[in-house]
Amino acid sequence: MLNKGLAEEELFSFLSKKREEDLCHSHILSSMCTVPHPIAVKAHLMFMETNLGDPGLFPGTASLERLLIERLGDLFHHREAGGYATSGGTESNIQALRIAKAQKKVDKPNVVIPETSHFSFKKACDILGIQMKTVPADRSMRTDISEVSDAIDKNTIALVGIAGSTEYGMVDDIGALATIAEEEDLYLHVDAAFGGLVIPFLPNPPAFDFALPGVSSIAVDPHKMGMSTLPAGALLVREPQMLGLLNIDTPYLTVKQEYTLAGTRPGASVAGALAVLDYMGRDGMEAVVAGCMKNTSRLIRGMETLGFPRAVTPDVNVATFITNHPAPKNWVVSQTRRGHMRIICMPHVTADMIEQFLIDIGE
């Protein structure tokens, strides 16, 4: 640590230089995060010092968290859902498996997880001492439902389905998984961290949420397609009392028990997430998603015209291509585990950006 503090001008000159080293969103095509909506930023700044980990000190902020869960529950066809604001999909997925493990006590628990699942499930299983039983994807890069039942045994505590996979933008057949979960009396967690704020706004959305009786919990990240400030995730559970399985005593706080994973939790990003949803409304979110899907379709058509075939036809705004072609200079794309080029058409990705990318990769 410095013995003598820096002058403000010197300090912010240093910080500005470091910020300039960061990449600009105008050329980022690989990220599932986006430029926050100005409304989210404004709301975030209003609640910068609030801590949801001690809600008795910040009752107004805590009420915003309840409203956020209510809004998301309504969107997912179950207004009475329980839940809380998390740091993002990783925390939500860990907590969902904690609930599943607490509900079904077995000596050697396992969970049946898609090949296409996010790497956070590996973290969750490592932390919780749960075996991962991975089910392969079919040709469309959705979970091969025919393999799921065979993977279940007496020690299986949960199934996982993906609604908007990180790498390919596919939505598993959650209806089929929900049926299996009901038949086998298993917990079903749906990771909709990305797709949760895309799918409900599509013209013909596939079923993935609490409208399916077998769905137990859903992860969704407002800091992705919800255009909130970071970090803003949410875990929703079908019955609020399910969260009680996670309770621990907190004798010196303004609440005597808590079920969250983190203690200190930012109220600012919750305010930002709720503000965007209420400001945009369903009509506004439908317009944003329609724009992202239009750009995705244009990108796919343009890439195929250039000789780069799609790997799959995505359900949400993630495009993948069968090519080893490097990204054009100054553009950032990513690669799937199967070696396909991966591009996400987030709200910050404009039609002009897509056209310029196609020009650059075609040269």
UniProtKB/Swiss-Prot annotation:
Checking InterPro entries in the record gives:
GrpII_AminoAcid_Decarb (IPR050477), MfnA (IPR020931), PyrdxlP-dep_de-COase (IPR002129), PyrdxlP-dep_Trfase (IPR015424), PyrdxlP-dep_Trfase_major (IPR015421), PyrdxlP-dep_Trfase_small (IPR015422), Pyridoxal-P_BS (IPR021115)
Q: Which UniProt keywords apply?
A: Decarboxylase, Lyase, Pyridoxal phosphate
Q: Does the keyword Lyase apply?
A: yes
Asked if Lipid metabolism is a keyword of the record, the answer is: no
Superkingdom is Archaea
Q: In which pathway does it act?
A: Cofactor biosynthesis; methanofuran biosynthesis; Cofactor biosynthesis; coenzyme A biosynthesis
Q: Which leading EC class covers this enzyme? A: lyase
Query: Where are the N6-(pyridoxal phosphate)lysine residues found in this chain?
Result: 224
Task: Name the GO terms of the biological process aspect.
Answer: carboxylic acid metabolic process; coenzyme A biosynthetic process; methanofuran biosynthetic process
Names of required cofactors = pyridoxal 5'-phosphate
What are this entry's molecular-function GO terms? aspartate 1-decarboxylase activity; pyridoxal phosphate binding; tyrosine decarboxylase activity
Q: Which reaction does it catalyse?
A: L-tyrosine + H(+) = tyramine + CO2; L-aspartate + H(+) = beta-alanine + CO2
**Signal peptide annotation:** none
Q: What does this protein's UniProt record list under function?
A: Catalyzes the decarboxylation of L-tyrosine to produce tyramine for methanofuran biosynthesis. Can also catalyze the decarboxylation of L-aspartate to produce beta-alanine for coenzyme A (CoA) biosynthesis.
Protein name, please?
Probable L-tyrosine/L-aspartate decarboxylase
